Design a protein with these regions (language model features):
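Residues forming the flavin
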Residues: 1-416
């Protein structure tokens, strides 16, 4: 690679992938760093996403094909930036890469999982099921190979290595560090759902049938823990009644003081999942205000006007668990000026977007706003943010923003 032309992109979700492809296909060298075992980010766990309401395969597979054919993008998964120093056109970067214990000889034959005696919680499905200690991160994993969670392995176990006919398992892999120079840097570090355990009154920790919105996406997905059937986590029975609790943590000075932008549309979309599976489902959506940015008026109107969808303006005070195990919601109904208490099969908390940048920044000069987002106006030249690292936005807006960010990164390279 030409040192002078390198662009570092931190984060391998849809934002980072888009930025990398746009820069590389313009002729610039890119290093793409992702801390998880696979690219794809949050979108890879969705059942469907706007604007076309298609599964992530329809967007990610095209981008993965472009990545495979590009000679200008160097991808490092299980990697984190530990240190950055320098100035625009001449940044020095230190990256730490963790071992996957499986090399690129892996052909996904699955012989290893057949003999593996250990299991681990499946973080891709938000711990709603389990995988073996050697596992494929998800059905669309890129790179497409297994990974070993050594912490889940039995001491001294080498059964997966013995079962592999392709010498793909390497239990002697070590953590490594490498350094390189980069002309410009883009943080496309994405978001995480706000920790619903902090919302003590909403029953997330006390009832298995109180879940958050990203867990709902996995329940609806054919690659999820229930193969696409929306069932109660507690007993795997079909869901007949659901409550969606909007602004679970968002627009709350004690938690996330801002609107997370996507939650209202997300809940209406998920209500539609339920109606498609069971048109007789009874759905209540508890909201403060319905905020649906973008050109989705017809979709919003169609869901809200469904006879089995009840829009209830009011805050949820608390969620308890009845003796029969079902969650019960106590809430205010502002328009009808009364308090209500109702039992549901399932409660979905529309938890807000929290920026991943809050966790760790390897460059002191980076400025975050009070909510943890990387405001573009306050950054050192040559350092940029893209997508939800900048502000809460949906997938479509993230892609548009990332395309523009690629151009900014390219301009830094050309000016230096």
């Amino acid at each position: 690679m030409n040192v002078d032309n390198k662009i570092l992109i931190v984060g391998g979700g849809i934002s980072g992938i888009t930025t990398a492809l746009e820069a590389a296909e313009t002729g610039y060298e890119v290093i793409l760093i992702e801390k998880s075992p696979t690219l794809g980010g949050r979108i890879s766990g969705f059942h469907q996403y706007f604007p076309k309401m298609c599964p992530p395969t329809c967007g990610l597979e095209i981008n993965y094909r472009r990545l495979r054919s590009s000679r200008k993008i160097e991808v490092h998964t299980l990697s984190e930036v530990k240190y950055i120093s320098g100035e625009p056109g001449a940044y020095k970067v230190l990256v730490e890469k963790k071992p996957s214990y499986v090399n690129d000889k892996c052909v996904l034959c699955d012989h290893c999982t057949a003999v593996c005696p250990s299991e681990r919680k499946n973080d891709f499905n938000y711990d709603m099921d389990q995988t073996k200690a050697i596992f494929l991160p998800n059905a669309m994993a890129f790179p497409s190979r297994y990974v070993i969670d050594r912490e889940a392995c039995e001491t001294g176990c080498e059964k997966c290595s013995e079962a592999c006919k392709y010498d793909a398992v390497d239990l002697n892999m070590k953590e490594e560090e490498f350094e390189f120079d980069a002309a410009s840097i883009v943080f496309a570090t994405g978001w995480k759902p706000y920790d619903a355990k902090k919302l003590k009154n909403l029953g997330f920790s006390s009832s298995p049938d109180v879940i958050n919105n990203v867990m709902m996406e996995r329940l609806a997905s054919v690659s999820g823990p229930t193969k696409g059937r929306i069932l109660r986590p507690s007993n795997q029975e079909p869901v007949e009644s659901v409550a969606f609790v909007q602004c679970a943590g968002s627009r709350d000075e004690k938690h996330l003081p801002y609107c997370s932008s996507i939650c209202c549309l997300g809940s209406l979309k998920q209500a539609n999942y339920l109606l498609e599976q069971n048109p007789d489902s009874r759905i209540s959506i508890f909201y403060i205000d319905i905020r649906t940015a973008g050109k989705y008026e017809d979709f919003v109107a169609s869901v809200q006007s469904h006879p089995n969808v009840e829009m209830i303006k009011g805050k949820v005070a608390k969620i308890d668990q009845e003796q029969n195990g079902k969650p019960v919601v106590d809430a205010e109904d502002i328009l009808n000026q009364k308090m209500i208490r109702r039992e549901y099969d399932l409660v979905v908390l529309a938890t807000g977007m929290e920026p991943n940048l809050k966790e760790q920044i390897p460059l002191k000069e980076i400025q975050l706003d009070e909510d943890g987002f990387m405001h573009p106006d306050f950054q050192k030249p040559g350092i940029y943010s893209a997508g939800t690292a900048k502000r809460p936005v949906d997938v479509n807006s993230t892609i548009q923003d990332s395309t523009g960010t690629a151009l900014k990164a390219i301009q830094t390279v050309r000016l230096n």
